[in-house]
Amino acid sequence: MNALNQKSPLILLISIILIAIGVVWLFFGTTQASGIDNQQVTDMLGRIVEIPSETNKVASISASTTVELFMLAPEKMIGWNEKRTSEENVYMKSTYSGLPVIGGGKKDANYENIISMNPDIVLIGHGGTDNQVDQIQSKFGSIPTLDVEGDNNLTSIKPSLEFLGKVLGKKEQSDKLISFYNDITKEVNSTVSTIPESERKKVYYARDSTGLMTNPPGSTHTQLIEICGGKNVVEAPLTKGSVGVSMELILQWNPDVIITSNQQFYDNIYFNSLWADVKAVKEKQVYMVPTSPFNWFEGPPGANTIIGIPWTAKVLYPDKFQDMDINKITKEFYTEYYHYNLSDQEATNILSSSGLKNT
């Protein structure tokens, strides 16, 4: 009887330990089996958000973060913000171009549709204030939302790529893209920084079919002009959107180069008598921005315009960038970041269609 009494505390202790082990195993075993394995991250507004340790399905409700998502992890995308055109899809694999339209941007997101697709996280580009992003979070319920800053500004884009590389588990890909950006920016800047102010090209960017909608200096939509050593001729205050100008003003500014993203304007400008006396038209210095799979110049401003740096440099100063192999650069960029292997002929077609004479 005494021996039994002496063993009772030991038996009780062992029983408690076994029960505790069972509870711990049950909790963690169930958690792993259910795929619940979370981590805390601090988004780019400083919000602490709990997200899955591994993200496999990602939604984006901003065009610029959607582009970054595609460049870093296309296999994780659940869809596009809006319907893509056949022209935009020329140089995109059908695997990606065929993804569904999930609906809208920050102001008109189709929350019900996105929630039904059960993404692991939702990306919000340049979301504004904590309160504004929290309001979006409340509409997504338990699906975590992350704010990404600098995604729509080429001069401050690197932190956004670093952040997404970490969140998406694509650090190697984001590091590679940042390295590409650094190298091409350094190459272009080392040349254009030596150009005297008096010799810098005057540039006008035409946004629409009339050519009379544009963006002033300081706009993210025209920042490639300044990055590549040009001078934006528009004399208008910086606004959030585009601005309308008159033909009289354009004749007064008399740009050396005109760049446009509008195919109709590009096709017609040399036959339009209103533009005939503009220096860029007289000297055949009008260029059409490549737009497949994304615009090289803007629309949206962001990571897609990295390839626009060497292109704009060649457009503005072809004599100073004779040794830059834009064909090779284009093929590399498309392979690595647009996941499409351009043939030599396709690269040539893209560049010659833009108006570049010597590629």
Spans of model-derived segments:
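Structural recognition of the beta-strand scaffold that forms the well-ordered cores
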Residues: A59-I61, I78-N81, V101, I121-G125, ...
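Alpha-helical, coiled-coil/dimerization segments enriched in small aliphatic residues
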Residues: G104-K106, T214-G241
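A short, structured surface patch at a secondary-structure boundary
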Residues: A59-M117, I121-G128, G230-V233
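Bacterial Sec-exported substrate-binding components of ABC uptake systems
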Residues: N2-V67, E172-Y205, V315, F321-T359
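A contiguous binding-surface segment within folded domains or other stable secondary-structure elements
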Residues: E235-M288
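Short helix-initiation/N-cap motifs at beta->coil->alpha
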Residues: M44-G46, L99-E112, L238-M247
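Extracytoplasmic ligand-binding site segments that recognize negatively charged/polar headgroups
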Residues: E87-E88, T129-V133, V148-F163, P196-Q223
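Structured C-terminal subdomain patch of bacterial secreted/periplasmic proteins
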Residues: T155-K166, D175, Y266-T359
